[in-house]
Every structure is written in C-alpha cells, then in structure tokens.
C-alpha cells in the first residue's frame, strides 16, 4: 500500500474540516485550527499543539494539516474515525471534564480513547485500503447532525408568529378604512391644515409593503401589527395651524436674542468703564509730569533709581526729581595706590633686613677660612660693604614700588656644558652654574691636611669640636681667644649698623605716611 498523494490529503482534510465541530480547537475553542493530534484524531490550534508537543509523542503525536505532506493512510484513518465530536462525547461519558492538558491526557479516559482510535483506524485501513472516504466519516456516529439556528425563529414563539400572520391577513381592510377618515377630517379643517395623506388611499401598495415586512422581519409584526389593529405605528395629525406654530417659533427666537443682548450689555459697559478709568489715570499722571517739568531723560533716571511716581503707592511723594541734575563724568585721574606702595615698601624693609642677616652669617663663616688675613684689610673690606649697603637702602625715592625679584642672568646657549658634563650621570645646579668652587677648595685643603694621619674621623674631616670630658675645664677653654673676640666685635658692629639703617628707614616711612 502506497502513501497518499498531496491532493488526496488536501481533499480529505477539506471534507473533515467542513464539519462544524472540527472548525474549532478541541482544547481551547479557537477558530480555524490548522494542527491535528493523530493519537486522538482531534483538531488543535497552534498554541495547543505546542502544549501537546511538551507531553511527548507517546501521549500525543502532532502534525500540521496544511504544511505536512507525508501523511500515511493509517494516520488519515485515525482522523476520519475520530473527530472533535467523538472525542468530547467520550471524555464526557468517562467523567473527564478538566481543562488542564497534563491531567486530561494522562487520565484513564485518554488512555482508553487512544486504544479505541488505534483499533478503529486499523480496521478501516484493512477494510477500505486506499479509498478516500469511509461510510461513517461524513456524519459522526456519536453526535446528531447539527441544525443551523435561525436567529428570528429562536426569538419568535409559535403563538406570536400565529398572531402576526392573523394580523397581517386582517390588515388590508384596516388600511383601506384609515385613509378615508383622515381625508374627511382634512376637508372639514379647511385649507390651512397639515400635510395631506392622500398617498395612503392606495390599498394595493400598502398591502405589498406589509407583506414584505412580515416576510423579512416577523418579530416586528408583534410590535406594530399584532398590538393594535388598524394602525401602522404613526401618530394621528391634530387640527393645528402650521403658520401659528411657525410664528410662535419665530417669536421664541426673538425673545432669546433679546435676552442674549441684555446679558451682553452689562459686560460691555463694565469694559468701557474700566477703559475710561485707565485713560483718566494716564491723564492724571501726565499732568503731574508736566507740573514737575520732568524731561524724558530725568524721568528715565528717576525710574531707574526707584524714585518714579509709578512706584509710589501713596499720594504723597518726595520732590527728588525737581532738583535732579545730570553730572557728566570726566576722565578720572588714576590715583596712586598709596597703601599698596607702603605695604610693599614695608615688605622690602623686612626682606632687606633678612638679607642683611644672611650676609652677616656668610661673613661669619668666611672669617673662619680667612683667619690668617690681616685685620686692617678685613676691617676695610667690612666698612666698604657696610657703606655700600647703606647707600643702597637709604634712598627712599629710589626704592622700587613692587617687591624686588632676584635677577637671574640668562645662561648662554653654548656647548661648554655639554662638553663638560657629557659623560656625567648626574649633576646639580651648583655644579652647572659653578657655585661649588669654594667648597671644593676647602674640601681639598682639609684632605691635604689629614693625608699624613693614619685614621680620621668625621669630626676631624668637618672640623667639628669634640666634646670635652666633664670637669676638665681650663681658663683657656672658658675665656675666648683673640680671634673669637675680634669676630664678636665685628658681628656686633655689623648688627648695630643694620639696626640703624632699619630704624632710619622706618622713621622715614612714618614721616612720609603721617607727616605729609
């Protein structure tokens, strides 16, 4: 037995899906299911087919009715002997009404139905072979054929329908008698009566319309035709004059317009009164400005300074603008920053004094190295230095206004430093600028003096005096020697000179600041 062709598969499923119960999903009731469970012979939607796949093929085998084309005859027979109607009735008979997929298809009823579908499909395959149709595949055996429901028939009871037909039969006579009465009433009313109803005199047309209404919508016969005999649901026209009604409507419109105008008039009057008050305020303000003779520029200045009349809340105002004068600013002369100048000068005094003390320390240190020099030349040098410092600092007018910065001589861009320090790994600024010559000379002198000794200490190398033992004092150690006394005198003299120079500068600055 060969496999069915694609055309056979489409033909079989087209006929199976034409059954009303197979047009919805077996599990959720969604319309137009396109998947099928071969194990139970039911049609499923795509969402429920995913749930069946998670159960496993031993419980439910899923295939597509539109995409899959490799169906076998046994699988087609399972779908033909099954169906949604057969499966739902079988599960209902065995008491399985749960909507949970796992509980439903793992139940005893699902197991029995699987075995039943398998046995019926095997019998149909042996009996019919490759025939497309089975004897019982068109009408499901376990469910009666569905009857199409009529919407109007379900809403209309038999008694009501009989009444509607009886009223429809008796209707033409009432239609013929009704227009005659209306025409008589119209003739008695005169010419100014309502619209004519002469069109209702034709009985044949009215009878046709009534019959068509009854055929299409029998439920409406209950409302219009069965409730009242001899009426179509239209109201009877009264003997009224349409001209009078029109006049009344026009009069009502005129009254409404007059009421609207009466309501709008107070609003317009309030707006006009507010505008008049605003203009009066402006006129009063302009008169005040004219009285005070305020020009445009003064008025702007007074408003800018916060002295305008518009900012005055009370009626009393100060006459500031009457004596207002415009002062033209001339080019200002830059004043000398006296305070800054004096502060800088004071700073220069303090910095100069520190410089003097630094020079004294340098002189003190140099006196040790040049002890062998004559005292006369030493005193001459010191006196010349003191006079130079006095001449430098006594001139107050020649002092700079700003703090003096040290003058650095620019280093010439030559190749001497590169030739001198080319092979050296590290150099200092003193070595680069040549400020280490004196220190190197003193160091070489100490090394030559200690070259004959067998051992030296750091105190001998740096000429540090050793601490003498306690109790080993002599008169020579207590009294200062002649060189120390001379050095002391020279230091006292230099300090006294510096103090006199500093005092002279302070007195001069006080006189310049407070005397003049």
Curated annotation (Swiss-Prot):
CDD domains: ArfGap_ArfGap3 (cd09028). SUPFAM superfamilies: ArfGap/RecO-like zinc finger (SSF57863). One of its GO terms (molecular function) is GTPase activator activity. One of its GO terms (cellular component) is Golgi membrane. The modification Phosphoserine is found at residues 231, 270, 274, 331, 370, 428, 451, 453, 455, 457-458. It is a peripheral membrane protein. It is found in: Cytoplasm; Golgi apparatus membrane. GTPase-activating protein (GAP) for ADP ribosylation factor 1 (ARF1). Hydrolysis of ARF1-bound GTP may lead to dissociation of coatomer from Golgi-derived membranes to allow fusion with target membranes. This is ADP-ribosylation factor GTPase-activating protein 3.
């Amino acid at each position: 037995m060969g496999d069915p062709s694609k055309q056979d598969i489409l033909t079989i499923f087209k006929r199976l899906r034409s059954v009303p119960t197979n047009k919805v999903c077996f599990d959720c009731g969604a319309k137009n299911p396109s998947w099928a469970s071969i194990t139970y012979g039911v049609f499923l939607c795509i969402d429920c087919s995913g749930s069946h796949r998670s159960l496993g093929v031993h419980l439910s085998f899923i295939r597509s009715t539109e995409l899959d084309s490799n169906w076998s005859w046994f699988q087609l027979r399972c779908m033909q002997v099954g169906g949604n109607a057969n499966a739902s009735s079988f599960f209902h008979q065995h008491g399985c009404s749960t909507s949970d997929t796992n509980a439903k298809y793992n139940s005893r009823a699902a197991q029995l139905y699987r075995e039943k579908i398998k046995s019926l499909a095997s019998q149909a395959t042996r009996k019919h072979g490759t025939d497309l149709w089975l004897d019982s595949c068109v009408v499901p055996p376990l469910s009666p054929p569905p009857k199409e429901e009529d919407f109007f028939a379900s809403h209309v009871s038999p008694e009501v329908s009989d009444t509607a037909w009886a009223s429809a039969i008796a209707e033409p006579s009432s239609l013929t008698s009704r227009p005659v009465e209306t025409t008589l009433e119209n003739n008695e009313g005169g010419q100014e009566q309502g619209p004519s109803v002469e069109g209702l005199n034709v009985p044949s047309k009215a009878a046709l319309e009534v019959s068509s209404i009854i055929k299409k919508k029998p439920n409406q016969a209950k409302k219009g035709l069965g409730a009242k005999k001899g009426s179509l649901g239209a109201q009877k026209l009264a003997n009224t004059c349409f001209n009078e009604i029109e006049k009344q409507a026009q009069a009502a419109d005129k009254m409404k317009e007059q009421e609207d105008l009466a309501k709008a008039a107070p609003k317009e009057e309030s707006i006009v009164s507010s505008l008049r008050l605003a203009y009066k305020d402006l006129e009063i303000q302009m008169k005040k400005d004219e009285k005070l003779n305020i020009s445009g520029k003064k008025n702007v200045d007074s408003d800018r300074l916060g002295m305008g009349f518009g900012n005055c809340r009370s009626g009393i105002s100060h006459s500031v603008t009457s004596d207002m004068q415009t002062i033209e600013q001339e080019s200002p002369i830059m004043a000398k920053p006296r305070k800054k100048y004096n502060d800088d000068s004071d700073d220069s005094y303090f910095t100069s004094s520190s410089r003097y003390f630094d020079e004294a320390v340098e002189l003190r240190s140099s006196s040790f190295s040049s002890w062998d020099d004559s005292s006369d030349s030493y005193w001459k040098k010191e006196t010349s230095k003191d006079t130079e410092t006095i001449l430098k600092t006594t001139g107050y007018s020649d002092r700079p206004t700003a703090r003096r910065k040290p003058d650095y001589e620019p280093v010439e861009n030559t190749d001497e430093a590169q030739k001198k320090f080319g092979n050296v790994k590290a150099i200092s600024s003193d070595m680069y600028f040549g400020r280490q010559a004196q220190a190197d000379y003193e160091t070489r002198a100490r090394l030559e003096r200690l070259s004959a000794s067998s051992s030296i200490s750091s105190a001998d190398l740096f000429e540090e005096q050793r601490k003498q033992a306690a109790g080993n004092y002599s008169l020579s150690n207590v009294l200062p020697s002649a060189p120390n006394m001379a050095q002391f005198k020279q230091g006292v003299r230099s300090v006294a000179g510096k103090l006199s120079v500093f005092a002279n500068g302070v007195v001069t600055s006080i006189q310049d600041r407070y005397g003049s």
